[in-house]
Swiss-Prot record:
Glycans are attached at residues 7, 9, 15-16, 24, 26. Keywords: Cell membrane, Cytoplasmic vesicle, Glycoprotein, Membrane, Sialic acid, Transmembrane, Transmembrane helix. It is found in: Cell membrane; Cytoplasmic vesicle membrane. It is a single-pass type III membrane protein. The keyword Aminoacyl-tRNA synthetase does not apply. It comes from the Eukaryota. Belongs to the SMAGP family. May play a role in epithelial cell-cell contacts. May play a role in tumor invasiveness and metastasis formation. The gene is Smagp. This is Small cell adhesion glycoprotein. The lineage of its organism: Eukaryota, Metazoa, Chordata, Craniata, Vertebrata.
């Protein structure tokens, strides 16, 4: 019967856990938690840095790389080729349903 927990005093029962005195941690546990927090912050920072770097390189490589499929200036053969292709397509059109 000696291993029963002690009954807390009425003052301890009246206070909320927020207002109770925090338990002190051992120095080793405090160092471990500090190291863990530092590692998490470092990983988050490196992840954000790598994402920003990838976005920068993507935007730099794709700068102005859109294709309009318009013929270049002074290429009449390209214009004629486009007109003949559209004429061939109007001769016989089949629709599969």
């Amino acid at each position: 019967m000696n291993n029963l927990p002690a009954t807390p005093s009425p003052e301890e029962l009246m206070t909320t856990p927020v207002f109770q005195a925090p338990e002190t941690m051992s120095p080793q546990a405090e160092e471990a938690s500090t190291a863990l927090i530092a590692v998490v912050i470092t990983v988050v920072f490196l992840t954000l840095l790598s994402v920003v770097t990838l976005i920068f390189f993507y935007l730099y490589k794709n700068k102005g790389s859109y294709v309009t499929y318009e013929p270049a200036e002074g290429e009449p053969s390209a214009i004629l080729q486009m007109e003949t292709d559209s004429a061939k397509g109007k001769e016989k059109e089949e629709y599969f349903i």
